[in-house]
Every structure is written in structure tokens, then in C-alpha cells.
Swiss-Prot record:
This is Large ribosomal subunit protein bL27. The lineage of its organism: Bacteria, Bacillati, Bacillota, Clostridia, Halanaerobiales. HAMAP family: Ribosomal_bL27 (MF_00539). Signal peptide: none annotated. GO terms for molecular function: structural constituent of ribosome. GO terms for cellular component: cytosolic large ribosomal subunit. The gene is rpmA. It comes from the Bacteria. Residues 1-21 are annotated as: Disordered. Residues 12-21 have a biased composition (Basic and acidic residues). Keywords: Ribonucleoprotein, Ribosomal protein.
Amino acid sequence: MSKKKGVGSSRNGRDSESKRLGVKRFDGQFVKAGSILVRQRGTKFMPGLNVGRGGDDTLFSKIDGYVKFERKGKNKKAVSVYTEEQFESVAN
């Protein structure tokens, strides 16, 4: 019989870094062209007017303007960016 206890190492202690996904700019907020609006996996939010979609599904603004979250159909959401004049007419 052995006189020493076998000491094993724990198999825990690993975790992946968070990906910092989510909405970065909110409804009514002013953004500059190229600003990241939403970081996502898949298309939870669709690109709307003046919004582009990157290779990793990130949504970004194509123009300087104001962010507007809208419904697209029954169960999809879209993010658009409007100029100040457009935003005032859409908001009312």
C-alpha cells in the first residue's frame, strides 16, 4: 500500500473571455458614420436605412444621424439611422 495520498489536479478553472455583444448605441442617440450600433451573432437585429452589416453581423452607421429601432415584420427588429430632418418626421 502506498504511504502517500495521490494528489490530482482539478479539471476546472477555465473560462472563455466574454465577447461583449449587445446594443452599443440606443434609440434617439446621435452617431457618426462608422459607429458600431449593435454587436451580435446572427441577425437578431436587421440593418435598416443607412445601416451596414459587417462580416461578423455587426451593424454600423453609414451616415451621421440619429438611431431608430423599428419593427420589421412580426418578429424581426431593424436598426436605422436618420438625418435630423428625417428623424423628426419619423419620431412624430
